[in-house]
Amino acid sequence: MLKQRTIKSLVKTVGIGLHSGRKVTLTLRPAPADTGIVFTRVDLPEAVEIHAAASAIGDTRLASVLQKDGARVSTVEHLMSACAGLGVDNLYVDVDAEEIPIMDGSAASFVFLLQSAGMEEQPAAKRFIRVKKAVEVRDGDKLARLEPFFGFKLAFTIDFRHPAVDKTGQTFTIDFADTSYVREIARARTFGFAHEVEALREMGLARGGSLDNAIVLDEHRMLNNEELRYGDEFVRHKILDAIGDLYVIGHPLIASYVAHKSGHGMNNQLLRALLADQEAYEFVTFDKVEEAPVAFLPQAQPAFA
């Protein structure tokens, strides 16, 4: 049986909130089988638990934001991406602010945290959502689509028409049957444009944004002294985000994801469109490990992880 996973021990870190600029303490704890990923705002007078779910995503303008009863947890996508990449099904996430710390702008710090805690299999079958027919959402020339595929594959195209971005790869495809999430995706950093950062700061946002946690571009070039971690880091980060956005559905997807200029909002619309069509998906488990897609096999976990 292909089993669910959680972490072996509690781990904790402190980072900066991208928008508040304040110190945020993040604690990751093991969770029982069939719990899912549960975020808890421990700073509130009465702690609020928010289960990761497509229906719990509210604001998607700047990040994926989980909301419940007026409580928010923002910028969950990088941590969710790391959980997907390492095959973590169940996890308690305690946070003492309304946003997950930005760390270095990638998922690498979260991968390190999870790996430091260790992985533990649980006595319950890992549940997948298998896409049975294509589902697509569009907005002008933007699109996001899920298609039937026995595995997990993503293809993303960006089009920013910026000199520093244009000279890098604009399209990236990854099939986790033979590729490592940790090696090929996890270290790709978020990016933004200097004029947008200034506009956000005037609105009281992006106070924690810096060259230490994002690739920042002016009208012509990259402002960071550090070189790109990948030759096509921009589009790889969009895939990192997409993996996290999709994992909010609560289970690994057995599917192919194709996107052109998609973002957090469109990714969430895609999940909602999938769930709205009961003929488009089914829940599956694998009693025999060897019958599962290669990307999710324990012996191949380093390939996805």
Swiss-Prot record:
Catalytic activity: a UDP-3-O-[(3R)-3-hydroxyacyl]-N-acetyl-alpha-D-glucosamine + H2O = a UDP-3-O-[(3R)-3-hydroxyacyl]-alpha-D-glucosamine + acetate
Necessary cofactors: Zn(2+)
EC number: 3.5.1.108
Any GO MF annotation of the entry: metal ion binding
Binding-site positions, Zn(2+): 78, 237, 241
Pathway: Glycolipid biosynthesis; lipid IV(A) biosynthesis; lipid IV(A) from (3R)-3-hydroxytetradecanoyl-[acyl-carrier-protein] and UDP-N-acetyl-alpha-D-glucosamine: step 2/6
Pfam family, one: LpxC
GO biological process: lipid A biosynthetic process
Class of this enzyme: hydrolase
Keywords: Hydrolase, Lipid A biosynthesis, Lipid biosynthesis, Lipid metabolism, Metal-binding, Zinc
Alphabetical list of InterPro entries matching this protein: Ribosomal_Su5_D2-typ_SF, UDP-acyl_GlcNac_deAcase, UDP-acyl_GlcNac_deAcase_C, UDP-acyl_N-AcGlcN_deAcase_N
GO annotations of cellular component type: membrane
Active site: 264
Recorded family membership: Belongs to the LpxC family.
Function: Catalyzes the hydrolysis of UDP-3-O-myristoyl-N-acetylglucosamine to form UDP-3-O-myristoylglucosamine and acetate, the committed step in lipid A biosynthesis.
Protein name listed in UniProt: UDP-3-O-acyl-N-acetylglucosamine deacetylase
Taxonomic lineage from the root: Bacteria, Pseudomonadati, Pseudomonadota, Betaproteobacteria, Burkholderiales
